[in-house]
Amino acid sequence: MALLLQQRVLVELVLTFGGMVLLMMAESVVPRVRTLAETVPVARWLNNWALAVFNFFLVLWLVYLLTSSELVTHWVSTGPAPLSGMPPLVAFVVVFLVVEFLVYALHRAFHQVPWLWRLHAVHHLDTQVDVTTSHRHHSLELLLVMAVLIPVVTLLGPEPLVLLGYFVVRVTVILVSHSNLRLPRGLDRVLRWLVVTPDFHRLHHAADRRHTDSNYGTVTPWFDYLFGSATDLPYGEHDRLVTGLEYLRDTRDSRVDRLMLLPFRWHRLRSRRK
């Protein structure tokens, strides 16, 4: 358990921050929204990076607590672990489907339950969506998601390499799907049957609430198609898509300190209607 959690954090750390740098360079070469690529929003980038770094230190601290707990270690070692010893490909598919369904359901809940939305709105307040948006989350949202996923994955008991493989896929798709990267129309149409593409997910970040409450998939859009929550936009209209939310669009609202306090100041800030 200890080794598994440590490996997961290390892989996500390297992939996330290394991937962000590479995709930021790619965004400047083949941008989906050219007006975004023509600016250098240093302040916004710094705020998004700062929140991502803070959350990673929080995860590291939680991993330390979990791996040093004898109770947790005993629970893991005596648990059912139905995936242990399964063929790796079968175990990967099970982990993929179970976790992606849970994340899909949690994501819908974060949009539909008012107090959860106050946390998740931190992610959606970014008015310029690019790869740095991918890990812009309130820390309490991160803790709630981990509180659901860690026990489920632990009970499934997949081999470490299976879980690491899933996290590599997950982190990679999350980074690419948030990036301001232009994919050819035909490629996007094919890929979005398998994975969440930048265009598919950008629509989820639209200021228009009809689109905000759609396209919940994180790695795959399958559950959006299955439960009727997928929406689409003509390929040529993405350049004109207004992202962020219809309120709290002032650049000051995206400062790290304000983002962390947002859920607790929600009603007062919303009353400004900006």
Regions found by a protein language model. Name each.
Residues 15-25, 59-60, 67:
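Hydrophobic core of alpha-helical transmembrane segments in multi-pass integral membrane proteins
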Residues 25-46:
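Membrane-interface helix-loop junction between the first two transmembrane segments
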Residues 19-32, 105-115:
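Membrane-water interface of transmembrane alpha-helices
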Residues 53-66, 73, 81, 85-240:
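Membrane-embedded catalytic scaffold of the fatty acid hydroxylase/desaturase
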Residues 45, 218-226, 256-267:
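A transmembrane-helix-recognition feature enriched in membrane-embedded lipid enzymes
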Residues 11-15, 39-53:
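Loop-to-helix transition at the N-terminal end of transmembrane alpha-helices
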Residues 238-274:
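A membrane-cytosol interface segment of integral membrane proteins
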Residues 1-9:
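Short, strongly hydrophobic alpha-helical membrane anchors
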